[in-house]
């Protein structure tokens, strides 16, 4: 058997090594971007007198108490009735991000609504007919211009700005063919007209 080699342990090398640097402090979490507040008083009304009269007529149709006011929760409905397609988030933003309690309790007059309508109308990010059709084309597995009604119901109730089951049913009433399919181009025309 071969003799063992005398292996010397480096004693001084371990002591001379500098201590590891402390771990850097974790970076602070990125601050949430602040929602820009919309200054409704700074919005210039660009609608004609005829348009304003039409908007006021629609606004007053939503007045349930006869005081020429609507609740904040009705603003989105009036905006959509007048042909705009704002998201719920856009409506809340133009309202100043009110609490749910304020949505149902606070009321506004037409003069307060008009700058909101102008702000939404000025928004260039509004989805177009083509945007909606392209979004539904993703679900057209056969490439024949139709989507399954059941799948569309599921999408409307569970993705994005979720709709209530009653809203989905009202929206889709009379849209399905005998096979349970929906022509999505006709469907988009239908929803953009209501």
Curated annotation (Swiss-Prot):
<feature type="modified residue" description="Phosphoserine">
    <location>
        <position position="73"/>
    </location>
</feature>
<dbReference type="GO" id="GO:0008307">
    <property type="term" value="F:structural constituent of muscle"/>
</dbReference>
<feature type="modified residue" description="Phosphothreonine">
    <location>
        <position position="71"/>
    </location>
</feature>
<dbReference type="InterPro" id="IPR050230">
    <property type="entry name" value="CALM/Myosin/TropC-like"/>
</dbReference>
<dbReference type="GO" id="GO:0005509">
    <property type="term" value="F:calcium ion binding"/>
</dbReference>
<dbReference type="GO" id="GO:0030049">
    <property type="term" value="P:muscle filament sliding"/>
</dbReference>
<comment type="function">
    <text>Non-regulatory myosin light chain required for proper formation and/or maintenance of myofibers, and thus appropriate muscle function.</text>
</comment>
<keyword id="KW-0007">Acetylation</keyword>
<keyword id="KW-0518">Myosin</keyword>
<feature type="modified residue" description="Phosphothreonine">
    <location>
        <position position="87"/>
    </location>
</feature>
<dbReference type="InterPro" id="IPR002048">
    <property type="entry name" value="EF_hand_dom"/>
</dbReference>
<dbReference type="GO" id="GO:0006936">
    <property type="term" value="P:muscle contraction"/>
</dbReference>
<dbReference type="GO" id="GO:0016460">
    <property type="term" value="C:myosin II complex"/>
</dbReference>
<feature type="domain" description="EF-hand 2">
    <location>
        <begin position="127"/>
        <end position="162"/>
    </location>
</feature>
<feature type="domain" description="EF-hand 3">
    <location>
        <begin position="162"/>
        <end position="194"/>
    </location>
</feature>
<comment type="subunit">
    <text>Myosin is a hexamer of 2 heavy chains and 4 light chains. Does not bind calcium.</text>
</comment>
<keyword id="KW-0505">Motor protein</keyword>
<protein>
    <recommendedName>
        <fullName>Myosin light chain 1/3, skeletal muscle isoform</fullName>
    </recommendedName>
</protein>
<keyword id="KW-0225">Disease variant</keyword>
<feature type="region of interest" description="Disordered">
    <location>
        <begin position="1"/>
        <end position="35"/>
    </location>
</feature>
<feature type="modified residue" description="Phosphoserine">
    <location>
        <position position="99"/>
    </location>
</feature>
<feature type="modified residue" description="N,N,N-trimethylalanine">
    <location>
        <position position="2"/>
    </location>
</feature>
<dbReference type="GO" id="GO:0030017">
    <property type="term" value="C:sarcomere"/>
</dbReference>
<dbReference type="GO" id="GO:0030016">
    <property type="term" value="C:myofibril"/>
</dbReference>
<dbReference type="GO" id="GO:0043292">
    <property type="term" value="C:contractile muscle fiber"/>
</dbReference>
<keyword id="KW-0514">Muscle protein</keyword>
<feature type="compositionally biased region" description="Pro residues">
    <location>
        <begin position="19"/>
        <end position="31"/>
    </location>
</feature>
<feature type="domain" description="EF-hand 1">
    <location>
        <begin position="50"/>
        <end position="85"/>
    </location>
</feature>
<keyword id="KW-0677">Repeat</keyword>
<dbReference type="GO" id="GO:0005829">
    <property type="term" value="C:cytosol"/>
</dbReference>
<keyword id="KW-0488">Methylation</keyword>
<keyword id="KW-0597">Phosphoprotein</keyword>
<dbReference type="InterPro" id="IPR011992">
    <property type="entry name" value="EF-hand-dom_pair"/>
</dbReference>
<dbReference type="GO" id="GO:0005859">
    <property type="term" value="C:muscle myosin complex"/>
</dbReference>
């Amino acid at each position: 058997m071969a003799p063992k080699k005398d292996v010397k342990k480096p004693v001084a090398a371990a002591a001379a090594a500098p201590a590891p640097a402390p771990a850097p402090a974790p970076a602070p979490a990125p601050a949430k971007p602040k929602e820009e507040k919309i200054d409704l008083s700074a919005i210039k009304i660009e609608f004609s007198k005829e348009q304003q009269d039409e908007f006021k007529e629609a606004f007053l149709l939503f007045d349930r108490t006869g005081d020429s006011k609507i609740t904040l929760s009705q603003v989105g409905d009036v905006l959509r009735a007048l042909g705009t397609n704002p998201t719920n988030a856009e409506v809340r933003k133009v309202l100043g991000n009110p609490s749910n309690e304020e949505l149902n309790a606070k009321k506004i007059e037409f003069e307060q609504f008009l700058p909101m309508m102008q702000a939404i109308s000025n928004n260039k990010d509004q989805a177009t007919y083509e945007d909606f059709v392209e979004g539904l084309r993703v679900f057209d597995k056969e490439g024949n211009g139709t989507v399954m009604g059941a799948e569309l119901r599921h999408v409307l109730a569970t993705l994005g700005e979720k709709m209530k089951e009653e809203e989905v049913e009202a929206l889709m009433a009379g849209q399905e063919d005998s096979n349970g399919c929906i022509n999505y181009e006709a469907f988009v025309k239908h929803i953009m007209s209501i």
